[in-house]
Amino acid sequence: FSKDDMNIYLQTFGMTLDVQLGALSLGQRKKIFMSFAMATHTKLLLMDEPTNGLDIPGKRQFRDFIQQGISSERIFVISTHQVKDIESVLNHVLLIDRSEIVRNEELKAGTDLEAYFEAAMQGKEVHHD
């Protein structure tokens, strides 16, 4: 863990270390937790619905945050229903439906993930649970 790096990541979100977690909104707490996770320099970072609770500027900051952390030595695994929030930072997709791998492939720049998902799931029953 690097406190200096955490400060750098927090600055991406316009935040500092001197905050009280209990006084923060869900979106603000997520920014703190993501900054902490990045500052640990973990090679695999799992994120479940990371843009949930973020406002529109926060979602842009999140994309900048991910771009800042991308390296050949780090993998981000993002589970989300909000594909528009993250499609510009993805280069690979693993689409799983009820334990079945539907797609596992590199993405071309500019891929519309909603259209990609619809094409991948064509003819399949879409589960909402």
Predicted regions and their residues:
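Hydrophobic anchor residue at the start of the ABC signature
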Residues: M34
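ABC-family P-loop ATPase nucleotide-binding domains
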Residues: F1-L26
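Catalytic Walker B motif of ABC-type/P-loop ATPase nucleotide-binding domains
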Residues: L45-E49
